[in-house]
């Protein structure tokens, strides 16, 4: 974890304090499934990773990466090609589980919760289906209950939000998550048929209150661009007047119609990066008085 004396850590603490003054909590992003090839664990703890051999790297160089003579599996979602720029952590390794618990406890010293990227990938059932014998012996305890209980022993009020798909939201709620993405409701609203939406909302209240509702996020198109205006208003009423967590994306209130990725593709990465830095500086300088020159774009 970064040194508490580093400027960006101090800035994070200031941001957290400003949020608290406004009755808000700070949630940071946590990626449990994979790390970059230059992560210190690659050299110090290669057993924390799903491993391969020279044959794997030769047969499938898009899925296995040689790092200083050691072959590691690249991170992956089982339904898509591997992410060639990251290495897959082994959720079944007890040493990794202990290290992750220490890491998240350190993160919990600096914020009020974490959004867990692709949380379902670390569930025992999913991980075993994805990696088979490469993962080794399946632990008796599941990944998330073990981690969540370890963190809450030190930080009782710490919140866990799961990015979740494949209709595993309920299972993740039962494993300790405070909230899970309600991607199913989003998809049904996008499809525009009333009956599936109505049936979805008939789920039990204890499921509903732990659902995170959204109309856009960094992986989805802008709501202002993807919904017809009349449908958009109705979808917003349904989404944000339901029990549970209300999830809003940067730029959603201003009605932005393009994402940063689209901006980079349209204007070039350099111009998009300049715009992003200008926005960041504006937020730091005047967080309550922003002139958003991209509103409606």
What are these regions (language model features)?
Residues 1-297:
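Active-site and adjacent substrate-binding regions of carbohydrate-active enzymes
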């Amino acid at each position: 974890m970064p040194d508490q004396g580093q400027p960006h850590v101090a800035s994070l603490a200031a941001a957290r304090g400003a949020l608290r003054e406004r009755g808000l909590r700070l949630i940071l992003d946590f990626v449990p499934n994979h790390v970059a090839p230059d992560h210190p664990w690659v050299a110090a703890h290669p057993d924390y990773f799903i491993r391969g051999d020279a044959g794997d790297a030769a047969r499938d160089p898009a899925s296995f990466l040689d790092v200083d003579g050691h072959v590691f599996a690249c991170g992956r979602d089982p339904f898509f090609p591997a992410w060639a720029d990251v290495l897959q952590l082994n959720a079944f390794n007890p040493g990794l589980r202990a290290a992750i618990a220490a890491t998240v406890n350190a993160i919990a010293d600096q914020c009020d919760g974490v959004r867990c990227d692709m949380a379902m990938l670390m569930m025992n059932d999913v991980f075993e289906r994805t990696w088979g014998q490469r993962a080794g012996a399946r632990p008796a305890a599941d990944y998330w209950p073990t981690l969540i209980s370890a963190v809450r022993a030190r930080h009782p009020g710490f919140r866990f939000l799961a990015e979740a798909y494949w209709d595993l939201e309920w299972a993740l709620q039962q494993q300790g998550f405070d909230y899970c993405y309600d991607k199913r409701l989003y998809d049904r609203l996008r499809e525009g048929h009333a009956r599936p939406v109505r049936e979805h909302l008939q789920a039990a209240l204890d499921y509903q209150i732990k659902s995170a509702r959204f109309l856009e996020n960094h992986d989805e198109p802008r709501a202002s661009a993807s919904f017809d205006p009349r449908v958009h208003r109705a979808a917003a009423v349904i989404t944000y007047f339901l029990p549970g967590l209300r999830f809003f994306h940067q730029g959603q209130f201003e009605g932005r119609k393009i994402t940063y990725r689209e901006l980079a593709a349209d204007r070039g990465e350099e111009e998009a990066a300049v715009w992003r830095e200008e926005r960041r500086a504006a937020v730091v300088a005047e967080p309550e008085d922003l002139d958003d020159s991209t509103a409606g774009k």
